Amino acid sequence: MAYAVVRIRGSVGVRGSIADTLKMLRLHKVNHCVIIPNTETYNGMINKAKDFITYGEIDKDTLIKMILKRGRLSGNRRIDQETVKELMGMSVEELAEKIVNEEILLKDTPIKPVFRLHPPRKGHNKAGIKKSFTVGGALGYRGEKISELLKKMI
């Protein structure tokens, strides 16, 4: 199952090693999202940057909405059903299914690997962006509930 990783906190006061990890994850700005496979290497990177990001397993429907609404090609061109069919030879639904099941990596497609999202409508959780999701905040692992956050941000 692929992870959706969203950067929540900014760059002020970030240690150098964590800043490098966020760069390797391609999370240069707040509210940027990447889809990564569930591998040991990426899990280590996520664990290191857990105080600046939130992550969880993305579902197919949310990924389809993200690709169609926020996905971009080179030159900042928008994506639609016909474009994906023409470039990839498959529908958006098939592409999303393969990305979620880690058969294809998003970076191996012509789609840009970073989704630039809005801040969440109605805000983050009540405890804010400095506390873990388990205690009511916005940071760290949130499992399947990442889809709720992404739907607020699309």
UniProtKB/Swiss-Prot annotation:
Taxonomic lineage from the root: Archaea, Methanobacteriati, Methanobacteriota, Methanomada group, Methanococci
Family membership noted in the UniProt record: Belongs to the universal ribosomal protein uL30 family.
Organism: Methanococcus aeolicus (strain ATCC BAA-1280 / DSM 17508 / OCM 812 / Nankai-3)
Gene: rpl30
Classification via HAMAP family: Ribosomal_uL30_A (MF_01371_A)
A Pfam family recorded for this sequence: Ribosomal_L30
Self-association and partners: Part of the 50S ribosomal subunit.
NCBIfam families: PRK06049.1 (NF004711), uL30_arch (TIGR01309)
PROSITE patterns: RIBOSOMAL_L30
Gene3D superfamilies: 1.10.15.30, Ribosomal protein L30, ferredoxin-like fold domain
Keywords, ordered alphabetically: Ribonucleoprotein, Ribosomal protein
Record GO terms (molecular function): RNA binding; structural constituent of ribosome
Listed SUPFAM superfamilies: Ribosomal protein L30p/L7e
GO BP term, example: translation
GO cellular component, one term: cytosolic large ribosomal subunit
InterPro entries on file: Ribo_uL30_ferredoxin-like_sf (IPR036919), Ribosomal_uL30 (IPR039699), Ribosomal_uL30_arc (IPR005997), Ribosomal_uL30_CS (IPR018038), Ribosomal_uL30_euk_arc (IPR035808), Ribosomal_uL30_ferredoxin-like (IPR016082)
Protein name: Large ribosomal subunit protein uL30
Domain of life: Archaea
